[in-house]
Swiss-Prot record:
Cited SUPFAM superfamilies: Helical scaffold and wing domains of SecA, P-loop containing nucleoside triphosphate hydrolases, Pre-protein crosslinking domain of SecA
GO biological-process terms attached to the record: intracellular protein transmembrane transport; protein import; protein targeting; protein transport by the Sec complex
GO cellular component terms, semicolon-separated: cell envelope Sec protein transport complex; cytosol; plasma membrane
The name this protein goes by in its record: Protein translocase subunit SecA
Subunit structure and binding partners: Monomer and homodimer. Part of the essential Sec protein translocation apparatus which comprises SecA, SecYEG and auxiliary proteins SecDF-YajC and YidC.
């Protein structure tokens, strides 16, 4: 009560922020007449003037009124569009390291030009981040004329671009690209082998469009660059044949529960577990298939990899559904983003899950991957010096933005008041009744000429609604991951009178739905349109626009509630843009995933008490409240998961930053000999300590062991035992110095042969390769540690603290291994004279030619079979070992194909 009273007196924090910013808006408006008087050249010259003032020490913030006034005037001249006052407010919010919540249709793209221009003045670069390539390209091309008019360069960063083009894009003042591509470029830069290979500059200012989608929905998805691991595709196929024999166990509280299933499914946690009966059956089936020996257990240490395959196959069959979680296209399994309904080409599930789904669908199984580098979006975007974002729906997630990214959320008022009618939810007992009610609603509204947008949560659901509409004879467009290419075109025309469009989730975000359709799209479809044609198209559009307004604007139908209220609000936000009329309603059934998992008991109890008849709907504030509570439950659970993920990833992040910073320092220096000398001393000290403990008696020394170790690991053959026999007075310290001196002397002799410059280059290459190899192994070890660490809770230990402690110990051990491996590799390397190198190169070429010839002779995989075939082809007696090889290489059989048989 007291908080409400104080808010009334002083206004909310949001109100106070906007009140402060409105003073700056008044200043910008006051400058407008002055800006209008400037010629184009004078307006363009303002950019250089601002840059000069920043160089002299003025802050970027002090330029806000003038810079925003310049951009507004330039926009009027280039686009014929003037920034509204609310867009100026949005621009200031974005410059203030905040999230700007701006409703759909309020012109977020135009708003972004203000802070992008202002922050690019410092010359450090601005990254505008979008959710897909289409939007990145569209926004860059749309805004390019404005920025270039003001003397700013614009770059586009797209997947598959060559490194020089990427470097050019990043060198631009303002760069447009997708979140994935920025993250992958960061990882690739930290895997580069020369400074010239890097493409990014220092991360300065990121302006994230659809910030909720990127920083919240995708926060649990790490970006991973991986390389192929060993091939185990046959095992996935074998295990996949077994899974259909297993029966799913019903929930214990269900009417049909008998306790006879082979595996249970936890839909909330997305987990599958074998029951005791299931374990017995699967072990029998594995023995029958010859995959496991009789009498063995699936849980024995030797069968860990087999258990991994079984779990992956079970998850693929029980939790992942075709046309919901993935689609199969051109013999490939492509993931569908659960939040956007878009396909994610090139993304693969980890832990063998993708291979298990490929086996289930009978497509080619690709190799498992090993992680080479990874980062989460949470940690990537926190690397920027300055971060801001905009979206139509952020307020429900304001707490998360604040606690994880330290970003406040400011709700920017709309330019015109919102008049959309949001109707209460209708709840039906079954899915079929719900679909029927939706069809009736669509019939009724389209008969009056009202356009309808139907939002579904998966491709499968969109196709169910589509089939029913076809049966009812209603023309419609379907927009889902399968029809991704014509997305913008379908969305642009979804406002046509009586148009019916079915879209998964937020597909088509970023494209406005214009009431009456898009006249611009019609003009663009014509080749060289005349003035008369354009005038006619505009007149026709105006008539359609007025008809749709009279029919009540765009009507939104939600076929199901999403786990997150924010995504429901995004669907609603497609209607009622810029003060247009509109309406929305959600249709639910007790069979919907959200209702079944989180809200079923209370709501179905209410419905039974009310004595519902088939086809009847319940529409009651209690039900709406129960559903909202279910969504809150899911949201808070998902927030906890993301927060916990971040706490664990922060540990890895500190290590990643340390490794990447060390790696970049290494890349930027040309001479690492001082580092090599320093770590050589450390390595030899630690190695000698293992065999000659410091300050110990000679009887405790293991001289044969030390000699063997020095020979095997450092290619150093030293007669240490002889030294000690001949020089009884040789004490421990002198012995250490002599071993190290011998090692340095041997290394210097190698350097004299190849030259100092070549040796420095080689040292750097060895350090980089060893670091990358050990970091890759460390990432895998951290992953295994992370997966099992929760079990420490049973021992009354805090898993997070245990993870921090153990991962630090692993990191320290990795750094020690790095030193050892580098010195060992450099010591063991064989240096050749130029003539020897040339001879080896000739031999390598001959070997390559011989292999090429073998491939022509036979397409079989097994080279030993090639040799046997050749013997058979000659039709002669068995080839003697010293006979010429029949492949025609000119070598003896024993030195050629004979070696392989």
């Amino acid at each position: 009560m007291l908080i409400k009273l104080l808010t009334k007196v002083f206004g909310s924090r949001n109100d106070r922020t906007l009140r402060r910013m409105r003073k700056a808006v008044s200043l910008i408006n006051a400058m407008e007449p002055e800006m209008e008087k400037l010629s184009d050249d004078e307006l363009k010259a303002k950019t250089n003037e601002f840059r000069a003032r920043i160089e002299k020490g003025e802050s970027v913030e002090s330029l806000i009124p003038e810079a925003f006034a310049v951009v507004r005037e330039a926009s009027k001249r280039v686009f014929g569009m003037r920034h509204f006052d609310v867009q100026l407010l949005g621009g200031m919010v974005l410059n203030d390291r905040c999230i700007a919540e701006m409703r759909t249709g309020e012109g977020k793209t135009l708003t972004a030009t203000l802070p992008a221009y202002l922050n690019a003045l410092s010359g450090k670069g601005v990254h505008v981040v979008t959710v897909n390539d289409y939007l990145a390209q569209r926004d860059a091309e749309n805004n390019r004329p404005l920025f270039e008019f003001l003397g700013m360069s614009v770059g586009i960063n797209l997947p598959g671009m060559p490194a020089p083009a990427k470097r050019e894009a990043y060198a631009a003042d303002i760069t447009y690209g997708t979140n994935n591509e920025y993250g992958f470029d960061y990882l690739r830069d930290n895997m580069a082998f020369s400074p010239e290979e890097r493409v990014q500059r220092k991360l300065h200012y990121a302006l994230v469009d659809e910030v909720d989608s990127i920083l919240i929905d995708e926060a649990r998805t790490p970006l991973i660059i991986s390389g192929p691991a060993e091939d185990s595709s046959e095992m996935y196929k074998k295990v996949n044949k077994i899974i259909p024999h297993l029966i799913r166990q019903e929930k214990e509280d269900s009417d049909t529960f008998q306790g006879e299933g082979h595996f249970s499914v936890d839909e909330k946690a997305r987990q599958v577990n074998l029951t005791e009966r299931g374990l017995v059956l699967i072990e029998e089936l594995l023995v029958q298939e010859g995959i496991m020996d009789e009498g063995e257990s699936l849980y024995s240490p030797g069968n860990i990899m087999l258990m991994h395959h079984v779990t992956a196959a079970l998850r693929a069959h029980a939790l992942f559904t075709r046309d919901v979680d993935y689609i199969v296209k051109d013999g490939e399994v492509i993931i569908v983003d659960e939040h956007t309904g878009r396909t994610m080409q090139g993304r693969r599930w980890s832990d063998g899950l993708h291979q298990a789904v490929e086996a289930k669908e009978g497509v080619e199984i690709q190799n498992e991957n090993q992680t080479l580098a990874s980062i989460t979006f949470q940690n990537y975007f926190r690397l920027y010096e300055k971060l801001a974002g905009m979206t139509g729906t952020a307020d429900t997630e304001a707490f998360e933005f604040s606690s994880i990214y330290k970003l406040d959320t400011v709700v920017v008022p709309t330019n015109r008041p919102m008049i959309r009618k949001d109707l209460p939810d209708l709840v039906y007992m079954t899915e079929a009744e719900k679909i029927q009610a939706i069809i009736e609603d669509i019939k009724e509204r389209t008969a009056n000429g009202q356009p309808v947008l139907v939002g579904t949560i998966s491709i499968e659901k969109s196709e169910v609604v589509s089939r029913e509409l076809t049966k009812a004879g209603i023309k419609h467009n379907v927009l889902n991951a399968k029809f991704h290419a014509n997305e913008a075109g379908i969305v642009a025309q979804a406002g046509y009178p009586a148009a019916v469009t079915i879209a998964t989730n937020m597909a088509g975000r970023g494209t406005d739905i214009m009431l009456g359709g898009s006249w611009q799209a019609e003009v663009a479809a014509l080749e060289a349109p005349t003035e008369e044609q354009i005038a006619q198209i505009k007149a026709d559009w105006q008539a359609r626009h007025d008809a749709v307004l009279a029919a009540g604007g765009l009507h939104i139908i939600g076929t199901e509630r999403h786990e997150s209220r924010r995504i429901d609000n995004q669907l609603r936000g497609r209607s009622g843009r810029q003060g247009d009329p509109g309406s929305s309603r959600f249709y639910l059934s007790m069979e919907d995933a959200l209702m079944r998992i989180f809200a079923s008991d209370r709501v179905s109890g209410m419905m039974r008490k009310l004595g519902m008849k088939p086809g009847e709907a319940i529409e009651h504030p209690w039900v709406t409240k129960a559903i909202a509570n279910a969504q809150r439950k899911v949201e808070s659970r998902n927030f906890d998961i993301r927060k916990q993920l971040l706490e664990y990833d922060d540990v890895a992040n500190d290590q990643r930053r340390a490794i990447y910073s060390q790696r970049n320092e290494l890349l930027d220096v040309s001479d690492v000999s001082d580092t090599i000398n320093s770590i050589r001393e450390d390595v030899f000290k630690a190695t000698i300590d293992a065999y000659i403990p410091p300050q110990s008696l000679e009887e405790m020394w293991d001289i044969p062991g030390l000699q063997e170790r020095l020979k095997n690991d450092f290619d150093l053959e030293l007669p240490i035992a002889e030294w000690l026999d001949k020089e009884p007075e040789l004490h421990e310290e002198t012995l250490r110095e002599r071993i190290l001196a011998q090692s340095i002397e041997l290394y210097q002799r190698k350097e004299e042969v190849v030259g100092a410059e070549m040796m420095r280059h080689f040292e750097k290459g060895v350090m980089l390769q060893t670091l990358d190899s050990l970091w890759k192994e460390h990432l895998a070890a951290m992953d295994y540690l992370r997966q099992g660490i929760h079990l420490r809770g049973y021992a009354q230990k805090d898993p997070k603290q245990e993870y921090k402690r153990e991962s630090f110990a692993m990191f320290a051990a990795m750094l020690e291994s790095l030193k050892y491996e580098v010195i060992s590799t450099l010591s063991k390397v064989q240096v050749r004279m130029p003539e020897e190198v040339e001879a080896m190169e000739m031999q390598r070429r001959e070997e390559a030619e011989r292999l090429a010839l073998m491939q022509q002779l036979s397409h079989q995989d097994d080279d030993a079979a090639v040799a046997a075939d050749l013997a058979a082809q000659t039709g002669e007696r068995k080839i003697g070992r010293n006979d010429p090889c029949p492949c025609g290489s000119g070598k003896k059989y024993k030195q050629c194909h004979g070696r392989l048989s």
